[in-house]
């Protein structure tokens, strides 16, 4: 399991490819270690197996986000979504590795709990997205525009706009259309032209 950085990737994504490479290397080492030390009993240790599955799933989601960003032409408006997705996935992957280290038994487990956790704290895979990053990614999908349609492409959008999700999306569209008027009113209030 390795993550190679493709040639000519966007400079904003290089660090994510590098961190995913570290993550994949760590995952490969820990899987081999588990197969060697735990062997057939790995199935019995369901929680440990679940942590391995969590780490792999979060790495897969991060690489999928990177691949989609590249495939769709590196659109600048998608960058906040990509950064949020990768930071979140890498933080969750790190959380899974911490769980693996803490629950590995025997003398090897003791080494992993000390050196492994120290290594993860010195050279973390990721931290949860900052509030600024969360706000930027949320802002990108708060308009019912082409980007929203592209990001949600392939998802079920009901035709009937009278109830449920269809009604909610209609309200979302109307709110987006009313945004310029709201901005004018807010500007007039700031200039004290309106109460």
Regions found by a protein language model. Give the residues of each.
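Flavin-dependent oxidoreductase catalytic core characteristic
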Residues: 1-195
């Amino acid at each position: 399991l390795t993550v190679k950085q493709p040639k000519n990737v966007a400079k904003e994504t290089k660090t994510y490819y590098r961190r995913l490479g570290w993550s994949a290397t760590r995952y490969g080492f820990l899987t081999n270690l588990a197969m060697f030390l735990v062997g057939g009993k790995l199935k019995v240790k369901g929680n440990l197996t679940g942590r391995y599955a969590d780490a792999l799933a979060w790495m897969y989601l991060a690489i999928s986000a990177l691949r989609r960003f590249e495939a769709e032409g590196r659109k600048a408006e998608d960058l906040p979504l990509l950064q949020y997705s990768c930071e979140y996935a890498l933080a969750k992957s790190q959380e899974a590795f911490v769980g693996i280290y803490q629950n590995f038994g025997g003398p090897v487990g003791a080494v992993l709990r000390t050196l492994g956790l120290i290594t993860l704290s010195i050279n973390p895979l990721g931290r949860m997205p900052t509030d600024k990053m969360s706000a930027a990614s949320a802002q990108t999908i708060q308009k019912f525009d082409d980007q929203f349609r592209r990001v949600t492409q392939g998802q079920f959008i009901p035709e009937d706009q009278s109830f449920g999700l269809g009604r909610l999306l209609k309200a979302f569209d109307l709110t987006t259309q009313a945004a310029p008027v709201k901005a004018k009113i807010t500007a007039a209030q700031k200039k004290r032209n309106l109460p």
